[in-house]
Amino acid sequence: MFKVIKCNELNEKLINKKVEINAWVKKIRHHGKFIFLNIRDRYEKAQVLITEEHLLKIAEKIKLEYCIKIQGLLSKRPPNMINENMKTGSFEILAKNIEIISKCNELPFMIEDDNNASENSKLKYRYLDLRRDSLKNKIILRCQATHLIRNFLVKKKFLELETPTFVKSTPEGARDFVIPSRIHKGSFYALPQSPQLYKQLIMIAGFDKYFQIARCYRDEDSRGDRQPEFTQLDLEMSFVKKENIFKLIENMLFLIFKNCLNIKLPKKFKKITYKTAMNKYGSDKPDTRFELTLQDISRNLKNSEFNVFKETLKNKGSIKILIVKDEADKFSRAKINNLEEIAKLYKTQGLYFAKIENNKFSGGIAKFLKTEEQQLIKTYSLENNDIIFFTANKKWETACKAMGQIRIKIANDLGLIDENKFEFLWVYDFPLFEYDENTKTYTPAHHMFSLPKKRYIASLEKIPNKTIGEIYDLVLNGVELGSGSIRIHNKELQQRIFNIIGFQKEKSEDRFGFFLKALEYGAPNHGGIAIGIDRLIMLMTKSTSIKDVILFPKNSFATSPLDDSPSKISNEQLKELGINIVTDDA
C-alpha cells in the first residue's frame, strides 16, 4: 500500500516506505541506464530516480509538464548528491510504478522565471504561467493575506456582508460598466465601482461593523497598470472617529506582514496632513523611504530681481526648492535637462538650479542670486558640491507637484530609495473639493459622501475651495493603498454638497433619491476605508505590476487573450435585449 503524499511531505520517517505523488514534470535528465525526473506540485519539488527497465521505457515517452503519478520507495540521497537548493534535496523516490495521467503539448514558452515570452502569450496561457514558482507563490501569499484579513475582522465582531453586483448607475468619476436588462428593455444595471452607497445603507440598517472582499469595476481608458476589475477590502463602522479606523488598519497590517513576510511593522504609522505632504514631499501620496524634502523659499526671495520669481511672487505664487547635499558633481547638463522636461510636463515656470562652488553659487541662475547669495547659503546651510533646484508657479499646488516628481526622479537616479523598506503613512485633512478651470465647477476631491470638518460646515457655500474634509488616505512607499473618510449622515448636509458640485435637487433625487431617503431614518455617524488588495499584494511581493498578483488579469487594453473577451454577441441576443449596434462610421 502506497502512502499518498505531497512533494513537501518527504521526510526521514518515510525512508524506505512506499509513497505515491501526483505531480508535473519540471525537468528530465537522461543518464543512460537511469533517468532522473524533477517533479513539482503546488507545495514543493522532488526528485525521482528511474532504474527499472520497464519503467525506463515509459519514462522515455515522458516530456516536460506531463502530469504523472509516481509510486516508489523514498530513499536518502548520497551525501555528494544532496541538493541544498531544494527543501527536499536530501531525498529521492526510487520509482516502482509510473502512470502518465495526462500528456502536455509542445509548450508555448518555458515554465521558467527568465523566459522571454511576451505578456500576451503569458496571459493567453495563464494556466501554464501560473506553474512558475514566483507567480504561484504570489497568488498563494494573496490567499494567505485575505484569509488573515477575514479572521482578524471576524474576531473584531465585523460581519462579512455581500452587496449587490447589479446596481443603479451613479457614476463616481470613471465610467460605469453597464448591463442591459432583457426584461426592462432600454434600462441598464451597472457594475459597482465600489460598494460605497450600500455599505452606508448597511450602517443605517444597524449593522455597526461591516466588511467585504469586494470586486469593483471601472470602465477607464487603457492606461498603464489599470485593470477594469479589481479587488478591495471594503469596511465601514458606525459611531467611529478616524483614529479608530487608523488603529484597526494598523493592527491588521501588522498581523499580515508578520505572518506573510515575517516583517514587524511599527504598531503606529506616521501621520501628516495633506498640506504638509504637499509642502514637504510634493505629493499627496509621498514616498518617505528617503529624506529628500522640499522647502518654500518665497519669503527669502521677496526682493528677487529674477523675473520668473518676481512675477510669481507678484501673483502670490510659490517658489519651491530642493537641496541635494554633496552630489552636485553627479548632475551633468544632460541630467538637468531631463529634470527640466519633468517640470515642463507639470506646467511650472521652469526648473532652475545653482551649484555651490568655493562657497558661492555657480552655474544656472547664480548670476541672478548675487544679492541673496550669502543669506541663502547661511539659511540653508549650503556647502560646496551641494546643488539647489528651484521651481515657481502662481499655483502652490502646481509648484509642489512638479518639484515632487523631480524629487522622485533624483532619488531614483542617486539610488536613495531602500527597496527593502515598507514605509506606511496616513495622509489626512484633504480638501473636500477640486475646482475645474475648464468647466468652472467644483468636483469632489475624493467622493461626494465625505463629511466636511465641523468648522467649515456653516460656510460651505462661501468657501468651497478652502473646505477641508474628514478624509484620509493610507500610503505605502509612494503608492496610494487605501482611501477613506467619515461620511455625511445628514440629508440636508448631503444635499448642500450635491448643490455645490452641480447636482441640484432634481438631479440628486434622480441619481441618489433612494440614498437620500435612507438618511431620513436615523442614520448613525459612520466612516470607513477601502484598501486595494491587488496593490497591497503587489507591494508586499515587490512585483512591478498588479497583473502579477491577479489570477486571471486583463492586458493593458482591458482584453483577455485567454478567452478573447470582450467578444461580440449574436444578432439574436442583441434583438432580445433591444440593442442596435451603431458603428463609428455610421
UniProtKB/Swiss-Prot annotation:
CDD domains: AspRS_core, EcAspRS_like_N. Aspartyl-tRNA synthetase with relaxed tRNA specificity since it is able to aspartylate not only its cognate tRNA(Asp) but also tRNA(Asn). Reaction proceeds in two steps: L-aspartate is first activated by ATP to form Asp-AMP and then transferred to the acceptor end of tRNA(Asp/Asn). Pfam families: GAD, tRNA-synt_2, tRNA_anti-codon. This is Aspartate--tRNA(Asp/Asn) ligase. GO terms for biological process: aspartyl-tRNA aminoacylation. The keyword Ligase applies. Keywords: Aminoacyl-tRNA synthetase, ATP-binding, Cytoplasm, Ligase, Nucleotide-binding, Protein biosynthesis. The keyword Aminoacyl-tRNA synthetase applies. GO terms for molecular function: aspartate-tRNA ligase activity; aspartate-tRNA(Asn) ligase activity; ATP binding; nucleic acid binding. The record marks H31 as: Important for tRNA non-discrimination.
